[in-house]
Amino acid sequence: MRYITAGESHGPQLTVILEGVPAGLTLAAEHINKELLRRQKGHGRGRRMQIEMDTVEIVSGVRHGMTLGSPITLIVKNDDFKHWTKVMGAEPISEKESKEMKRTITKPRPGHADLNGAIKYGHRDIRNVLERSSARETTVRVAAGAVAKQILKELGVEIAGHVLEIGGVKAKHISNLSIEEIQIITENSPVRCLDKTVEQEMMDAIDNAKSSGDSIGGIVEVIAEGMPIGVGSYVHYDRKLDAKLAGAIMSINAFKGAEIGVGFEAARQPGSKVHDEILWDEEQGYTRKTNNAGGLEGGMTTGMPIVVRGVMKPIPTLYKPLASVDIDTKEAFQASIERSDSCAVPAAGVVAESVVAWELAHALVEQFGKDRMELIQQNITQHNKYAKEF
């Protein structure tokens, strides 16, 4: 499976085309809209989320609530486009009209794609960069992830995400929660945190950053249960599932690091405390005493829960802007301000769930049969029986 997204932040719409989704998957707009709404929530979101009420339109690949096996096209309209029709229109305009609009941006913002993108593509108006590099694009990545989650659900895999840290405020580790319990707790938390004792402290940190014109980042974790043993591969570097998951996390706007299992903590512990001892019993088959590997060894699943974390830097659009240089005059200046969040970590956790779900669904479809859901389900059932008796 693969997908491609298109659209600008203030353009008419965002589009994603999904290829390789098996036939026979139950899919309706309500499945996707539920995920889009989750992305819009979270303490610290900016005014854009009050403008947009994201809903999806399914325009191909689905008939009567069932996928056809052909490419699926999903569209999310930008309600704010009505205020940007001239600025973001596709038709040519004169230089005079361009100047009269006064929307040309020549001051790159530190931490954004602005300067590097302008140099790469030769844009003298940085708006041509920021419109596409905006995290608004993650709207349709979440839509794609919603389709992947539906695949996982029908294949017996559950997934959930939560926030571990915001602005240096850390949640306590809470274990032995089911995926359903994690989902219920986080959906009722303004910061998607499992630890209620630090919830208010996280919100205060966000509010303090906002009042001072600053922004803060954090850490999110995604957990998936029900993956069969041996999904992925050790044979080639580009087929290792952990590499794909890390790449997916790092592809999210403003994410600067990824961990699987105990992650970087493994460098501080001896091997005897890091590696997961193998157990076997008649009911479960092969299992592990611990899950420090985060459900992945040698690029393949171990049958234990998948545990992936991502680090999000503070959003670089600040209301107390940092120093920059005008690309036209070369004079020092304060970077331009676009409408932005003070903290998007809770929302980014939903995006992280989506990209992890896509990679897991892709791996299952690739390994167990690409054409139709019924065949994939049968093959996974046979594989699980084989692995248990191995």
Swiss-Prot record:
EC number: 4.2.3.5
Keyword Flavoprotein listed: yes
Keyword ATP-binding: no
Keywords assigned by UniProt, alphabetized: Amino-acid biosynthesis, Aromatic amino acid biosynthesis, FAD, Flavoprotein, FMN, Lyase, NADP
Signal peptide span: none
Name of the protein: Chorismate synthase 1
NCBIfam families: aroC, PRK05382.1, PRK12463.1
Gene that this polypeptide is encoded by: aroC1
GO MF annotation list: chorismate synthase activity; FMN binding
Quaternary structure, from the entry: Homotetramer.
The organism of origin for this protein: Bacillus anthracis
InterPro entries: Chorismate_synth, Chorismate_synth_AroC_sf, Chorismate_synthase_CS
Required cofactor names: FMNH2
Biological pathway: Metabolic intermediate biosynthesis; chorismate biosynthesis; chorismate from D-erythrose 4-phosphate and phosphoenolpyruvate: step 7/7
